[in-house]
Curated annotation (Swiss-Prot):
The lineage of its organism: Bacteria, Pseudomonadati, Pseudomonadota, Gammaproteobacteria, Enterobacterales. Gene3D superfamilies: 3.30.590.20. The gene is ybdK. This is Putative glutamate--cysteine ligase 2. It comes from Salmonella schwarzengrund (strain CVM19633). One of its GO terms (biological process) is modified amino acid biosynthetic process. It comes from the Bacteria. ATP-dependent carboxylate-amine ligase which exhibits weak glutamate--cysteine ligase activity. The keyword Ligase applies. GO terms for molecular function: ATP binding; glutamate-cysteine ligase activity. NCBIfam families: gshA_cyan_rel, PRK13516.1. Its EC number is 6.3.2.2. Keywords: ATP-binding, Ligase, Nucleotide-binding. Homodimer. Belongs to the glutamate--cysteine ligase type 2 family. YbdK subfamily.
Amino acid sequence: MTLNDFHVSEPYTLGIELEMQVINPPGYDLSQDSSTLIDAVKPQLTAGEIKHDITESMLEMATGVCRDIDQAAAQLSAMQHVILQAASEHHLGICGGGTHPFQKWQRQEVCDNERYQRTLENFGYLIQQATVFGQHVHVGCANGDDAIYLLHGLSHFVPHFIALSAASPYMQGSDTRFACARLNIFSAFPDNGPMPWVSNWQEFAGLFRRLSYTTMIDSIKDLHWDIRPSPAFGTVEVRVMDTPLTLDHAINMAGLIQATAHWLLTERPFKPQEQDYLLYKFNRFQACRYGLEGVLTDAYTGDRRRLADDTLRLLDNVTPSARKLGADSAIDALRLQVKKGGNEAQYMREFIADGGSLIGLVQKHCEIWAGQ
């Protein structure tokens, strides 16, 4: 399979994708009716796109190319309104969160889509288990070499992005003890985690060619790396965040990634090296397991530091870039979140500790997404 040339796009432009849960009240399990909902809302869209994801209990909201987080917020808000109206008419609910807390993967129906059916053939039950819900953020790049540099730079902050967005403590009716259990679902996939090391776009093209020899990779979309280049869009796509419970938090996470990309490409604070990834999976695990209370270990010095403290340092570093991009409100909101010491996974556990049920938790998530 030949790799597309890297499409030239305007640096730092944004695209946001949100994988949403389609809920069936009053039991608040996942519905299998996303196709009905998607067909109802598509004719009403004026910007962005609403489409299928892997299974019939999922739908994806995707913006077009946006200059800044305000434009992205406007597009997502308009889609949110249309979806909620259609969901109400069809007696369905919509919510965020990285996992549904008590759905059974065996009940999930893979969409009648050629690509997803081929993926089901390749990966079997793993695809049904991948009924989990993430936020993806695309950032525009001028060329392929910049994209590879940006990918390596952003990889330093994968634990930070995970910890800030963690919203998946419950799965299959149980507390997993993880802040973000969603990413564990992909651990059995052969392309889980970081992209194999390359130093420029030419080397990446060679890597992709070799991956295509496996017959399991037909396009970039078939690769499940934490961060991947998207040559057709001219972007780098960050894929490690849980879908937030609110649109505001989704916008804040996108603003952080946009500002971090600007800081990385203008300041060039790192010289990427393969050794940067030696402890990548250990630090990623700390973020998934403990959220902001996790501990990062430096691959070169062995120094250890709290993820919360290092996240505050990242927010300080990218603040000037955020101001230039109009994303400073996002950085301010995330800084406040870190100082308060929580994420949405912690809120979910507090809800249950206060006597709530998992059914009640999903109902509450639907109310939060609807702004009630």
